[in-house]
Amino acid sequence: MRRILTLLLLFNVVRSSEAITGGVVNLRPKQIINSVGIGDRFGGIGTSSDESDHFKLLAADGDSLLVGARNAVYNLSLSTLSVNHKIDWKPPAEHIEECIMKGKSKTDCQNYIRVLARKSAGVSLVCGTHAFSPKCREYTVTEFGIRNTRQFDGQGISPYDPKHNSSALYVPGTNQLFVATVTDFVGNDALIYRKTIDETPSSKSAANIRTQSYDARVLNAPNFVATFAYKEHVYFWFREIASEAIDNNEEPQIYARVARVCKNDKGGARPANERWTSYLKARLNCSLPSGSSPFYFNELKAVSDPIDAGNNNHVVYTVFSTPDSDVRMSAVCKFSMKKIREEFDNGTFKHQNNAQSMWMAFNRNEVPKPRPGSCSPDSTKLPENTVSFILHHPLLHRPIPSVAAPLLVEGADRADLTQITVLPRVRAVGGHNYDILFIGTSDGKVLKVVEVDGNATVIQSATVFQRGVPIVNLLTTKESVVIVSADEIASLPVHNCAQQTSCSKCVQLQDPHCAWDSSIARCVHGGSWTGDQFIQNMVFGQSEQCPEGIIVREVFDDNESEAQPEAVSRSGYPKEHSTITVVLVAAVASLISLIIGAFIGIRVNRWAATSEPHRSASSTSGSDYDSFGRARLTRHDSLTTATKVDHGFVPQSKQSVDATSLVMSINATHHPMSMSQHGSGINTPSRDKNAIVTSINQNTLPRDYKVKKVYL
């Protein structure tokens, strides 16, 4: 039943994507790059091949890249990925033994560094899992090297499990750390937490504030994806089980969320003095619209930093996917921070009267004032009804829609999209600026995508790691993109213009980094693009200025190494894989496999039911006779009875037809033919042809001739 429902959803995708995206899905890259083993690489130090470093990109500071790893923090050169400094921090042996006794593996019972913050010049905060007993340290750079100056409990700051999805943000100047993680050994108590880090152990701590424990209305088994500060708020992006939604099978649904808190939130009056008074969350809507039944991408996987979009607005690029199923899809959606702020500031709240009632919009006239969730100069003085309301109604009623339809949709025959980073406002020939997206996949590739007038073009697909190694972090600089897997880090250039050797192919890339220099006849990378010798067309990917003129464009299959000619439509654009083609092929394949599986199961059950009571040595595998000596009907045998065989030398008489039919194959010349020639699985005894015919004409068979009976 679940598979049939999945197929029905696929047809909904077809209808939605045909109407919204013009039938384009699985956009083919303009060029393919195999970068496995190429470029600067870092693979850890002192880690065996069967151990994982669980690399996590923590920060970029000038020319330094700070990476958390297994029992270590690496300070890498951003330009070469060589090691500038390394801090070793391994748990004591007794902590590892205690962790193992609690049921964890020796691999997990190490110290995986998950949080790092630069507090001030020369002082860094480092936190790790520390054998499922999180700890934090402050390291200070002195003239004698890097020294550990302080260690304290990291509960609520670092996760326990290195595989747990968590995020953290240090706000300079406030000495506060905003964290989204779990605070117990088994990972059930999820929280969004603000921790004030003391400069000295004796200094007075400000209020540490967190979300309520074990309250599904606030957080329900979340997977945290990203955290960043924007104006007076801190935003948390995650996915969780939606308390307000249950599907037709009464199974939990995963929804994508964005939540926010005020930076200056001091908590409420007692007993809510350690609870947020500004915590709100809303659902994110990344979907293919189709009337009353959109196709949703519900699972948030990655979020970019806010990108300046002009007009006092920023946008955020995100990666979504559908839940695990036979047909899994991914999408890239863009959200406006201005729209998000408007919904948080003015949106309707959602509420449920009791556990059995439906979730509904809360009556605006009954919302207390000041508005719950708004920032207050001193939240401890807020009215009790305002604080109580926000503790019980943190969810907004309306989902926050993406900016238009998804920019990019990857179908079931593609790898999942896992990470995203953006190189903003790249200048093209002519002075226009474009955002370039670098998107990681679950099979070790990085897609380079440009957005032109709201449409996505996949410029390049680069294979960075061996197939099956997911991309877990991405970082861009002006000239390079840093790609992180669990056990390897690579740095590659942001462009590969020199791969194209003709004007038409260079222009076809639609890459703002690349243009054809007619003065030297090369595809070059530039920044200022001064001069009129540069040929580029970001909108159509074709130019009459090229010596070749406008040619039939070539697109690349990302599974092949060579270009394949692609037909050009009347508009001049190449035809991509149609959504109807990709999705229907997947749907038909799934349906056929379902039917074949059911058919085989029925046949096996029938065979087992009939053969079990009569099992004997004679009923061996491969025999064409059952345990009673009766011939089995094979799939190669004809069911045509003797009365329907039209040949001249067999007399038709009632006596020659009874419940037992002789099955014989007659060729075009009306000569009896050995059944073995039809691949029946047995070899008919060699007989004289004339003797057989004579016997048949006399309505008899030779005594040693075997007859195959068919019971109808």
Swiss-Prot record:
One Pfam family hit: PSI
Keyword list, A-Z: Developmental protein, Differentiation, Disulfide bond, Glycoprotein, Membrane, Neurogenesis, Signal, Transmembrane, Transmembrane helix
Highest taxon, organism lineage: Eukaryota
Function: May function in growth cone guidance.
Membrane-spanning residues: 582-602
Predominant cellular place of this UniProt entry's protein: membrane
Domain spans labelled Sema: 28-494
Subcellular location: Membrane
Cytoplasmic topology ranges: 603-712
PROSITE patterns in UniProt: SEMA
Any GO molecular function: chemorepellent activity
Gene: smp-1
Disulfide cross-links: C99-C109, C127-C136, C262-C375, C286-C333, C497-C514, C506-C523
Membrane topology reported for the UniProt record: Single-pass type I membrane protein
Side of membrane Extracellular, spans: 17-581
Protein name (database record): Semaphorin-1A
Stored PANTHER family: SEMAPHORIN, SEMAPHORIN-1A
GO cellular component, one term: plasma membrane
Glycosylated sites: N75, N165, N285, N346, N455, N559
GO process annotations (BP): axon guidance; negative chemotaxis; nematode male tail mating organ morphogenesis; positive regulation of cell migration; semaphorin-plexin signaling pathway
Signal peptide bounds: 1-16
UniProt record similarity statement: Belongs to the semaphorin family.
